[in-house]
């Protein structure tokens, strides 16, 4: 039957359009899959699907000695591996009452800040690429290459270092390496100035990031945010100042904060944090060149004997063998240790039962709390803004899925 203009049209149900963002999308930063519900080009709902990189890290750690558990932490946030080892080592040291010598603390802080540069350089450059700028990653990766060489010269590995140990670090840094790190720190600010000139004041970059993904301070705290996500919203909360660990209380640095809590503020905070990390690294280098001393605890329960000693003493050889096969025993108890990782507060809740293996090791990954807010942050924005918001969260799937 033909419809006239007056006759009733049959009702056609209008439903929103659903698309998959990832897991192969270049802006998904890993194996993230998000189901987006779109009304035209406006995002109505975001449903993140996680678990594609789940490896059962927390359970695996329960079957390993305290020393054997360290390499698992490199594989969480693989953009800044040593920062995660740091949290685990702090937890073990607090539980076992181990003192770390001053030189060991300085090396740890130095390499934690190198990790912060590695992570922030990767984030700000790929974030710029997500919104259309192609040059920053080429510049950023040149500097990251030098920093990864510092990792390699200290531990033998560019990424999965396993360099931090309960009680200190594996071995001392050569004098030349410390000098080279100092030389890098003196030239690094010019790269940040170049990035600032190219990206920070860029009109198109600002149009893509200003007033996108705004988080008020109340919302940030309610969602369990930490790190740059809180500082970008105006709270000067940094564990290096709020709950100082190692020798951070002796170092001079500032905590940059944002005003509006949008993607642009988070980017600017990360840029300024790199300058502050550079400042911390220079202070560590100056002190390492002047102050000698041990780099690991002198408590022989947790530190292996020297190579030369093992060639002379049968007891030292037995001690070395026992330490690396059975490991050291940690008293019963529970402890929470957190570090200011590049992504936010990375925490380790460790339960010891008096044996040589952890009874339970709960990992508090900052990216996990940040990812859950994707629906809240993207609702009402355009489809193109989803990758901008995701880039400003700085998510790595090693730590989200664990």
UniProtKB/Swiss-Prot annotation:
Xref: InterPro entries: NADH_Q_OxRdtase_suD (IPR001135), NADH_UbQ_OxRdtase_49kDa_CS (IPR014029), NDH1_su_D/H (IPR022885), NiFe-Hase_large (IPR029014)
EC top class named in words: translocase
Domain of life: Bacteria
Pfam families, per database record: Complex1_49kDa
GO cellular component: plasma membrane
Catalytic activity as recorded in UniProt: a quinone + NADH + 5 H(+)(in) = a quinol + NAD(+) + 4 H(+)(out)
Record key words, sorted: Cell inner membrane, Cell membrane, Membrane, NAD, Quinone, Translocase, Transport, Ubiquinone
Annotated localization: Cell inner membrane
HAMAP family: NDH1_NuoD
PANTHER family, A to Z: NADH DEHYDROGENASE [UBIQUINONE] IRON-SULFUR PROTEIN 2, MITOCHONDRIAL (PTHR11993:SF10), NADH-UBIQUINONE OXIDOREDUCTASE 49 KDA SUBUNIT (PTHR11993)
Description of how the protein assembles with itself and partners: NDH-1 is composed of 14 different subunits. Subunits NuoB, C, D, E, F, and G constitute the peripheral sector of the complex.
Family recorded in the similarity comment: Belongs to the complex I 49 kDa subunit family.
Physiological role: NDH-1 shuttles electrons from NADH, via FMN and iron-sulfur (Fe-S) centers, to quinones in the respiratory chain. The immediate electron acceptor for the enzyme in this species is believed to be ubiquinone. Couples the redox reaction to proton translocation (for every two electrons transferred, four hydrogen ions are translocated across the cytoplasmic membrane), and thus conserves the redox energy in a proton gradient.
Protein name in UniProt: NADH-quinone oxidoreductase subunit D
Organism placement in taxonomy: Bacteria, Pseudomonadati, Pseudomonadota, Alphaproteobacteria, Hyphomicrobiales
Gene, per the UniProt record: nuoD
């Amino acid at each position: 039957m033909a419809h006239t203009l007056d006759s009733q049209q049959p009702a056609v149900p209008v439903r929103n359009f659903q698309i998959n963002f990832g897991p192969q999308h270049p802006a998904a930063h890993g194996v993230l899959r998000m189901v987006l519900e779109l009304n035209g080009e406006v995002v109505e709902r975001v449903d993140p699907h996680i678990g594609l990189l789940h490896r059962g890290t927390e359970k695996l750690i329960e079957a390993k000695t305290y020393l054997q558990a360290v390499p698992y932490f490199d594989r969480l946030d693989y953009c800044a591996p040593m920062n995660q080892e740091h949290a685990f080592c702090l937890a073990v040291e607090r539980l076992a009452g181990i003192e770390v010598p001053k030189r060991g603390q300085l090396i740890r802080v130095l390499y934690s800040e190198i990790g912060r540069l590695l992570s922030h350089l990767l984030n700000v450059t790929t974030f710029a690429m997500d919104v259309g700028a192609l040059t920053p990653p080429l510049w950023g990766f040149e500097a990251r290459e030098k920093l990864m060489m510092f990792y390699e010269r200290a531990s033998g590995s560019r990424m999965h270092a396993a360099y931090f140990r309960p009680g200190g670090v594996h071995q001392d840094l050569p004098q030349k390496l410390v000098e080279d790190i100092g030389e890098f720190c003196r030239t690094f600010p010019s790269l940040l100035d170049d990035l600032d000139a190219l990206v920070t004041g860029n009109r198109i970059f600002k149009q893509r990031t200003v007033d996108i993904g705004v988080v008020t301070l109340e919302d940030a705290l309610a969602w369990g945010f930490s790190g740059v996500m809180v500082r970008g919203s105006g709270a000067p909360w940094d564990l290096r100042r709020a709950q100082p660990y190692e020798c951070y209380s002796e170092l001079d640095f500032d905590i940059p904060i944002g005003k509006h809590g949008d993607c642009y503020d988070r980017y600017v905070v990360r840029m300024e944090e790199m300058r502050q990390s550079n400042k911390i690294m220079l202070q560590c280098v100056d002190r390492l060149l002047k102050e000698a001393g041990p780099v690991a605890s002198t408590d022989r329960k947790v530190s292996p004997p020297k190579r030369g000693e093992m060639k002379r003493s049968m007891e030292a050889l037995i001690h070395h063998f026992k330490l690396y096969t059975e490991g050291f025993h940690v008293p019963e108890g529970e402890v929470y240790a957190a570090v200011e990782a590049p992504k936010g507060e990375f925490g380790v809740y460790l339960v010891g039962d008096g044996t040589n293996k952890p009874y339970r090791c709960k990992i508090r990954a900052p990216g996990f709390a940040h990812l859950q807010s994707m629906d809240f942050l993207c609702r009402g924005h355009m489809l193109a803004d989803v990758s901008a918001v995701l880039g400003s969260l700085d998510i790595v799937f090693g730590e989200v899925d664990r």
